[in-house]
Structure formats: structure tokens, C-alpha cells
């Protein structure tokens, strides 16, 4: 499938070919950048999201993330909408939970199953332009925004209209298609046999790293919008740090410090991603690059930084135990690269019901630090260096972006799963309308059954408590389909090491019943029991729980 560059191609050529003075974008409408990293874990940064810095924070260099944390708000309890990519991405574009849209697995995945369960019917083609959902880029475009997609899309399936972000409301698409990872590798894959899945990157040179290429294109797109004095929404969707892991040439030498090769590669990819963030910040702060920031649009640009799901843990990461790492700082770090350890203190990682699979880094900041420079800042006065501990969910991004843009939410109230975070960011009263929910009725990869939580599940967080309903993996008694429930107090047990289901059965049953009622409300797809070819029977209200 060949993708056009944009609906604005002629205008962009004009902007390049005729020298004009760069002027700030319309101050009445703030620019919004969603900087979305792929598979980045809560600990994969030098910014500490735990109560205290950990050894993981010392293993990575992300200075531009630290810049955002210093100038904006850090969310320590931010959650992806799902433990794998496409569902979270669709949630952020629609404001609806993946259970409601039925985009509840990664687009392109076949029928996933473990020994006793298989996938229910789901929206396997992903987001489509003729679907029932209002799309964020479409809504913003109708209200005067230029909408720009850069990098990984993975919204719609191969060969479908939704594979092209332009059909979903983006004016410009650079690099986005049906692919869920860096097909063809990280070094100029747009010049090889996969060139068609990297639309409009063909003018980038041979040998260029993919992260760098999409960054250059993002900076160009920002430049065009500034020249045209047009407010913009940019979905800056990194391919990093998705597998296959490969070193970023500009940064790998800085990680030859005793860590395993795959971990050195991973760290270099993170630093390259952070450098991408830095390039975008610099473009906003000094658009024409002359050192004079009088033309800055940073004060009128909001950046939301986050990840689409929890970090890789067992999948492709090193599993060799403790290693002494001596980074350039000179400090010796005892790093533990054991199985299921890479997101600690969070349990497990991508694909899992546990915190390591869904808790993600999140920063929100104005790119510039002159709060009185533009009127819109008065309605969203983010306190520099603030920490927000309220649990938030990526279902919230849609409503938040519209609120920041001053655009009415077109989704009927009963169909909204997220809510605006503007009051929370502004230090005003914020009350969560409903618990946070996750639903994954599929098997991410292979028949695991080893306590990683990588199996079909539904989960809910309400206040400090999190309940998980596992549909069954047959491990407990070897006789087949065998559902179970787990309960955790995250305020006391962030690592989810102490299942409270047996000691607090009343609370567990109440929360489980609320979760099951919500599944019915949104008509969530339920895993199919292989031997009966029927959906798994959900527990009746008040029924007893099985505890391991």
C-alpha cells in the first residue's frame, strides 16, 4: 500500500520553497505534542518514578526527560490502557477503553490461545475511518488544528484503510503504517524491501538510524506549522524501544561498562529516544535556530510524554542475574538482570496483568517556562517540578487534549471512559468518576503459566486496591480451565507479592463483582473455553472465590 505524504503537500512545498520570517503559531490555541514511546518501562529512565531513586535510574541517561520533569508534572501512578500496544494507541485516539472498542489485542495478532482458552471475536482490523468512534485528530482538525503523525502507527490492520493514519484524521503521515515494530531493522529500513511500510521517509539517507530519521521529519513538520502560523497536534510515536533491540550508533559507546550487550543496546536506544525529545524541545524554543528565542512557540506548546505499555522484562532482555556496572559517572552499580526483574519494584512486564505490564512513565509540561507569555497558560498553570500521585489512565488523554485545545468532547457521556486531567494538572479539585479498568482476553505470547500474569485477564483498580481476574491457565490442578482472583493493596505492596484474596474475601468479592459488572456494561469479549467452544462463565455476584 502506498501512502500519500499528506493532505497538505502543496502547502508544505510552498513553505519550503519561499523564504519567510518565522512567526509564532496562533496563541489562542495551544500546540499539543503526544510523545509516545514504545514498550518503555517505568524504570527505564534517569527520572525516578518510585518514591526513591533506584539502581535502574542510574543505568540510563535521559536528560531531556529530566528537563520535562523539572519544568512540568511527573505522574508516578500513570497507566497504559492495556499491556500491549495497539489497544492503548486506539484508546488515546478515542477516549474509550479497549474493552469497549474491542480493540483488545495488538493489531495483526492471530488467534492467541493457551492450553485451555482461545481468543474471542474482536476488532482485529483495529481503528477504521468508517468505525463508530470519534477520532482525536479528526475532531482537532475540524477545529483549526494541523494534525501530524510521525513514526509508529499500528492503528489499523494490513491492507485496511485504517493502516494509513491520514484516513483517521491526520493531515500528515510520516512513517506510520500497519507495522507494530521496526520492520527491516533500525538502519535506514525505508530503503529496503520494507520501504512501503515507512511512508515518506524515502528522502532520508542510507545508514541513518530510524529514531534520528523520524526526529528530523518531526522537526520539519513543526517548522512548517510555525511558518504557516497554524496550531498543531503531533502524535510523535517512537519505534523505540520495541524489539528487535539494536544499538543506536551515536550512543552505544557510552554503555560499554560491564552490562550485558543487549542491555547496552537497550540503554543506547533509550538515550537516542531522549535525544529526539531534546531536538523537538529545541525546535520549539528556537524555531529558526539563531540563538534568539523571540520566535519561540514553546510557551504555547504542551507536551505529554508517556509509553504505550509496560516495559519489556523477560521478553528479549538479559536473564543473567547480578552484574557490576561501572557507568561513566564512576559509580559502581549492582544491577540485577534476573528473569522478571527489569521493572522492579514492579512485577513482570509487557503483556502482564501486573504493574510491570501497565504502569508507565508520564510527564506533562509546557515546553517553555514563561507562564504569563500566552493567555492559555492561565487555565493550565502546571507547577514546575510537581509530582502527581493520583492514578491516571491513558483513556484520559483524549478528553484532556480536547480540554486543552478548548474543543467540546463529541463523545456521549455514557460512552466516555476517560476524563480530562486539566483540573488535576492545574492543582484544582479532581475526582475520579470510575475505577480504572484493563481487559486482555488473549494470550500475548506462548503458553506461559509461570506466575508472570501473561495470560487472559481482566483487572480493576479502585483507590489503593487492585483486583485481577485470571480466566485460567490450568496450571493449578492440571485439569484445565481454572479461573482465579487476586487482590493487592498497592499502597503497601507495589510489587504485588501478597495476594489478599484469602485474608480479605469480602473486599475481594465486592471488587471482583464490580469488575464483572463493568465487563457486561461495555460488552467486553470473553475468552472462549476450547473444550466447550463457549465463552468462559463469569462468576455470579457474591459467589465464592478460588485462592491459590
Regions of interest found by a model, annotated:
Residues 9-19:
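Bacterial N-terminal signal peptides
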Residues 103-146, 153-267, 368, 374-378, ...:
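Formylglycine-dependent
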Residues 30-43, 64, 68, 92, ...:
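Beta-strand elements within well-structured catalytic alpha/beta cores of enzymes
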Amino acid at each position: 500500500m502506498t501512502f500519500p505524504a499528506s493532505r497538505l503537500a502543496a502547502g508544505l512545498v510552498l513553505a519550503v520553497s519561499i523564504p519567510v520570517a518565522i512567526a509564532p503559531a496562533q496563541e489562542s490555541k495551544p500546540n499539543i505534542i503526544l510523545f509516545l514511546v514504545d514498550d518503555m518501562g517505568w524504570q527505564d529512565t534517569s527520572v525516578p518514578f518510585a518514591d526513591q531513586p533506584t539502581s535502574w535510574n542510574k543505568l540510563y541517561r535521559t536528560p531531556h526527560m529530566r528537563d520535562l520533569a523539572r519544568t512540568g508534572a511527573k505522574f508516578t501512578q500513570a497507566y497504559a490502557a492495556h499491556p500491549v500496544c495497539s489497544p492503548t494507541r486506539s484508546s488515546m485516539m478515542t477516549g474509550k477503553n479497549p474493552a469497549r472498542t474491542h480493540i483488545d489485542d495488538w493489531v495483526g495478532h492471530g488467534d492467541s490461545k493457551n492450553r485451555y482458552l482461545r481468543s474471542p471475536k474482536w476488532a482485529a482490523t483495529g481503528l477504521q475511518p468508517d468505525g463508530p468512534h470519534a477520532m482525536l485528530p479528526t475532531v482537532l482538525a475540524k477545529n483549526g488544528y494541523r494534525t501530524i503523525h510521525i513514526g509508529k502507527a499500528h492503528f489499523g490492520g494490513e491492507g485496511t484503510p485504517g493502516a494509513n493514519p491520514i484516513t483517521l484524521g491526520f493531515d500528515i503521515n510520516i512513517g506510520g503504517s500497519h507495522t507494530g515494530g521496526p520492520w527491516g531493522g533500525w538502519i535506514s529500513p525505508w530503503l529496503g524491501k520494507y520501504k512501503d511500510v515507512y511512508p515518506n521517509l524515502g528522502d532520508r539517507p542510507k545508514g541513518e538510524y530510524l529514531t534520528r530519521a523520524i526526529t528530523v521529519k518531526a522537526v520539519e513538520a513543526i517548522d512548517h506549522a510555525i511558518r504557516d502560523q497554524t496550531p498543531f497536534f503531533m502524535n510523535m510515536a517512537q519505534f523505540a524501544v520495541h524489539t528487535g533491540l539494536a544499538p543506536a550508533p551515536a550512543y552505544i559507546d557510552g554503555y560499554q561498562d560491564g552490562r550485558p550487550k543487549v542491555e547496552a543496546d537497550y540503554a543506547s536506544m533509550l538515550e537516542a529516544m531522549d535525544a529526539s525529545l531534546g531536538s523537538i524541545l529545541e525546535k520549539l524554543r528556537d524555531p529558526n535556530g539563531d540563538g534568539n528565542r523571540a520566535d519561540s512557540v514553546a510557551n504555547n506548546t504542551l507536551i505529554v510524554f508517556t509509553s504505550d505499555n509496560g516495559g519489556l522484562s523477560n521478553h528479549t532482555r538479559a536473564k543473567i542475574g547480578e552484574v557490576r556496572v561501572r557507568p561513566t559517572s564512576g559509580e559502581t552499580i549492582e544491577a540485577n538482570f534476573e528473569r522478571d526483574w527489569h521493572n522492579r519494584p514492579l512485577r513482570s512486564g509487557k503483556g502482564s496483568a501486573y504493574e510491570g505490564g501497565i504502569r508507565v512513565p508520564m510527564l506533562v509540561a509546557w515546553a517553555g517556562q514563561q507562564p504569563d507569555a500566552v493567555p492559555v497558560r492561565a487555565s493550565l498553570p502546571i507547577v514546575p517540578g510537581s509530582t502527581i500521585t493520583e492514578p491516571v489512565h491513558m483513556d484520559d488523554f483524549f478528553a484532556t487534549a480536547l480540554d486543552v485545545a478548548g474543543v467540546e468532547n463529541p463523545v456521549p457521556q455514557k460512552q466516555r471512559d476517560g476524563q480530562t486531567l486539566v483540573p488535576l494538572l492545574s492543582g484544582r479539585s479532581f475526582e475520579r468518576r470510575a475505577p480504572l479498568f484493563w481487559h486482555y482476553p488473549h494470550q500475548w505470547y506462548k503458553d506461559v503459566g509461570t506466575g508472570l500474569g501473561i495470560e487472559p485477564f481482566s483487572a480493576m483498580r479502585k483507590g489503593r486496591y487492585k483486583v485481577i481476574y485470571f480466566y485460567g491457565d490450568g496450571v493449578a490442578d492440571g485439569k484445565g480451565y481454572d479461573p482465579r482472583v487476586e487482590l493487592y493493596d498497592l499502597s503497601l505492596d507495589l510489587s504485588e507479592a501478597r495476594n489478599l484474596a484469602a485474608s480479605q474475601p469480602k473486599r475481594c468479592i465486592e471488587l471482583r463483582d464490580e469488575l464483572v459488572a463493568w465487563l457486561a456494561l461495555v460488552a467486553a469479549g470473553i475468552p472462549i473455553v476450547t473444550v466447550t467452544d463457549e465463552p468462559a462463565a463469569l462468576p455470579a455476584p457474591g459467589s465464592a472465590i478460588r485462592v491459590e
